[in-house]
Amino acid sequence: MAEKALEAVGCGLGPGAVAMAVTLEDGAEPPVLTTHLKKVENHITEAQRFSHLPKRSAVDIEFVELSYSVREGPCWRKRGYKTLLKCLSGKFCRRELIGIMGPSGAGKSTFMNILAGYRESGMKGQILVNGRPRELRTFRKMSCYIMQDDMLLPHLTVLEAMMVSANLKLSEKQEVKKELVTEILTALGLMSCSHTRTALLSGGQRKRLAIALELVNNPPVMFFDEPTSGLDSASCFQVVSLMKSLAQGGRTIICTIHQPSAKLFEMFDKLYILSQGQCIFKGVVTNLIPYLKGLGLHCPTYHNPADFIIEVASGEYGDLNPMLFRAVQNGLCAMAEKKSSPEKNEVPAPCPPCPPEVDPIESHTFATSTLTQFCILFKRTFLSILRDTVLTHLRFMSHVVIGVLIGLLYLHIGDDASKVFNNTGCLFFSMLFLMFAALMPTVLTFPLEMAVFMREHLNYWYSLKAYYLAKTMADVPFQVVCPVVYCSIVYWMTGQPAETSRFLLFSALATATALVAQSLGLLIGAASNSLQVATFVGPVTAIPVLLFSGFFVSFKTIPTYLQWSSYLSYVRYGFEGVILTIYGMERGDLTCLEERCPFREPQSILRALDVEDAKLYMDFLVLGIFFLALRLLAYLVLRYRVKSER
C-alpha cells in the first residue's frame, strides 16, 4: 500500500489524490471534495532568463503610412492594381506581445510579411527600426519568422534538430552550444521528448520546437503567423504563455491571431486590428471595450471582446468600418488611451529608450562559413535519407527485386545471337527503370523539403549554395549504390560478356543515366509550386525522352524537323553507350544454335540499331554535360524562387 501511495506522489498527485487512491484500494466510497479546485498556472517563466543565449540589443519597430498593392490578373493580362493595405501607422515596442487581429482577408498575414521583410515590391511608406530606416538584410538577421505550418524534417530527433540550429547559428564552443540547447529545451518543456523524432510530436510540441529552433541565436524580434491554429485550448495557452514570457524577456513579439479565447485575448499587451486592409483599432487590450463604448458600440456582458470586435469588423452590426477608420486616423485611439490612464493628463508610456547595443549585427554574412554550413547540412541530409524508409529502404529493395525479376525473365540470353532484340529490350528496360527510380523519388520529396528550406534560409540559417551542394552531394552515394546493385544482378544473370571492363562501363553508364534523371527531378521539384504539379510533370517529361531514345524509332526514321529532339534525350546516350559496351569494343561472334543467325556478328547489331559510328566517350561526355546543366538550372530556379519570396 505504501508503494502505491509513493507512486501516486511521484506522478505529481497531491495528498488528497493519494488518500483517494488508498480509500479506493480498500473498497470504500471516495471522499467528497470540500474545497474548490484551484487551477495550476503553467506560465513558462524560464523563457525570460536564458543565461547562455547571446546578448542582443532590443528593437522597436515603427511604420508610417504603410500601403501595399499588387497587380491583378495573370502576368499576360494585367488588369490594374489592387490595394491590400492602406495607410497603416503605428509602433511596436520591446517587451510587448502584439496581436494583429481581423477577419479573414483583412490583410493580417500580408501586413506581417511586410514588417518581416518578406514583401518589398508594391510597398509604400516607411519602416523604422530603433528610429532609423530599416536596412533589410541586417533586420532579417536580427528577426525570425515562425510560419503557421510547422515544417520540420521528420526524421531528425528534437535534440538533433536543435543542435543543427545551434551549429549553424552560433560560433561558440560545442560545450556552450549543448548547454544552451539543454536550457532552451528545459524552459520550453521539450526535454522529455528530446530523443523523439519530430514526426511523432504533438501539435503543441511541434509549435514549441519551431520556436526553440529560432530562439537559439536570441532574435530580438519574432514574428508568428497564426501560432494557435490547429491546437487545443491547453496547447494554445502554452504557446501564448511562452510568447508572453519571451516578450517580457525584452523581445518584440508580433503575431497574427484570428479569434482567440477571452483568456488568451487578455494575455496580449497591445492589439492592432485590421479590416479591409485598414486599421480599426490600435492600443492596449484593456482599452478596447471602453474605446468601442465611446463610439456607441457596446460589447454584450459575458461576451468575448475578441469575438465582438471581429463581428463588428465583419459587418454583423452594419457597415461600421468607415467610422472606425476615421476614428483611428483622427487619433481617437490615442485620446481614449490617455483618458483611461489613472491620471487624466498622463501621456501613454512611450517605448523605452534604446540602450547601447550589446551585440550589434552589422555584418551581412552568415554566422558560420559556407564550408561549415555545407558540412552540417550534408550530415543532416545524409542522416535524413538514411532514416527515410520510403526514399531509401524501399528504393534499395525495389532495385534488388526488379533486378532479380529481369534476370529471371531474360536469363542467359546475352550471348545468344537469336535473341539479340530480346537482349536489347532488356538493356533498354534497365535504362528505363533506373531513370524512373531516380526521377520520381526526387520529384515526390523535394517539393516537401522546399518549405523547410524556405523557412530556414529566409531566417538566415545558411546560404543557398551551401544547402544546394549538401542536398545534391548527400544523395549521390545512394544514387550510385542502387544502380550498381541492380547492374550487378542483371548483368550476370542475363549472361552478358564476362569481362570486368564491360561490366564496369555498363554500371557507369547506368549510374550516369540515373544521376541525370535525378538532376531532372531536382529541377522539376524546384520549379513546381505543389506536389501535385510535380507528380504530373515528372512522368510527362519522360515521354519525349523515351520516344527519342533510339529504341522505338531509329534516328534516320525520325522526320528531319524533329531530329533535333533526339539530341535532347539523355536516355538516348545512356542506351547508345550500353549497346556499344555490350556489342562493341571488338567483341567476338555470338553463339547461335539455329541454322540462320543474321546477328551472329556484333557489328551487324550496331548497324541495325544505327550506332555503328557512335563513340562511347561522347556518350559519357554528353551525359556529364546534361548532369551539370540540369544541376545548374535547378540552382538558378531555386535562386529565383527565393528572390520571389522576398
UniProtKB/Swiss-Prot annotation:
Membrane topology: Multi-pass membrane protein
Ranges per topology, Cytoplasmic: 1-393, 447-472, 525-532, 639-646
Family, similarity comment: Belongs to the ABC transporter superfamily. ABCG family. Eye pigment precursor importer (TC 3.A.1.204) subfamily.
Transmembrane segments: 394-414, 426-446, 473-493, 504-524, 533-553, 618-638
Reported induction: Protein expression is stabilized by cellular cholesterol status and cholesterol synthesis intermediates desmosterol, lathosterol and lanosterol.
InterPro entries: AAA+_ATPase, ABC2_TM, ABC_transporter-like_ATP-bd, ABC_transporter-like_CS, ABCG_dom, ABCG_transporters, P-loop_NTPase
GO CC aspect terms: cytoplasmic vesicle; endosome membrane; plasma membrane
EC id: 7.6.2.-
First-tier enzyme category under EC: translocase
Domain called ABC transmembrane type-2: residue spans: 386-641
Subcellular location: Cell membrane; Cytoplasmic vesicle membrane; Endosome membrane
Classification via CDD domains: ABCG_EPDR (cd03213)
Name of protein: ATP-binding cassette sub-family G member 4
